[in-house]
Amino acid sequence: MRFFLGLFIVFISADFSFGQSLQSSATPKTPPSKAAGCAPPTTTTYLELNNVRAMIHTAGNLWQVPNQNFSQYEIPKNSGIMALFTAALWLGGTDVNNQLKLAALRYRNGQDYWTGPLTKITAETTYENCSKYDRHFVTTQDMIREFNAWFEAGLADQQNGTNTQSQQFPDYKVPEIIKEWPAHGDVTQGQDYYLAPFYDFNGDGHYNWEDGDFPWYDIKKDKECNVDRSVSLYGDMNYWWVMNDKGNIHTETGADPIGMEIRAQAFAFASNDEINNMTFYNYELINRGTQTLYNTYFGFFTDGALGDPFDDYVGCDVSRGLGY
């Protein structure tokens, strides 16, 4: 290996921990269940806040250039050096009849994941729903801090008869992403009302940016991380999207779907230390399926190729839930 760099990718989970590989002796088969006929997701965005330039997809995998044997996890950025090839969630288990239910990807030779939330009771989706959510919702912490400062300055002006907002923010325009933040699912279709995390400024339970609500970075530091399991937005720059495994027939694994809704985040920090060479990923898993899974394994498939792909080593620190 001719090139070495302190490289670190952290996969954070809100509802599970990575560990054992997904294994089963059952042979996958093409499921007879109804599918929504969703098209494969196509959105690709680069996460390049710090010293890493990483290709992020809505389709369930990371880094690999679509339909090519090349990757885009470049570190240092603009060096032409690709340190990792691809990665994806592997989720699987058996139902009460010992039938395998599995959602997984390797190199996108097929598709097991689609975009959009599922209905809460029946774990269903539609072609239109999948298409609507085929995007990354990109925010930065600086953007949210500026919006909050602008809004609170306006409140102070109303209370005190001042004009601080116009003086300090003369040309400010509320970013479109704050206005169109996907805080709520479509309850008329049976989706969860609460979708993407948001800060509810007036506590009315409804997202409205004109009331001071914003995509929820914990900028007010009122989240007790040691006891609060609710998921906020992380990082200095954050890409949020939502996926499911019920949008169509599983052509990557050939297995029956689970009915899993996955709320994903890819994020990074800008810093002057090792974190500047890192990217982070968070997956919140919600089982919308009607059946309990047994013998269940959640894992994260990673094909790393640091320099020469034939002399790489992997390891883990079990006590810290860390793979490297």
Annotate each predicted stretch with a short phrase.
Residues 1-23:
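Bacterial Sec-dependent N-terminal signal peptides
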Residues 20-324:
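A long-range scaffold signal marking pre-active-site subdomains of enzyme folds
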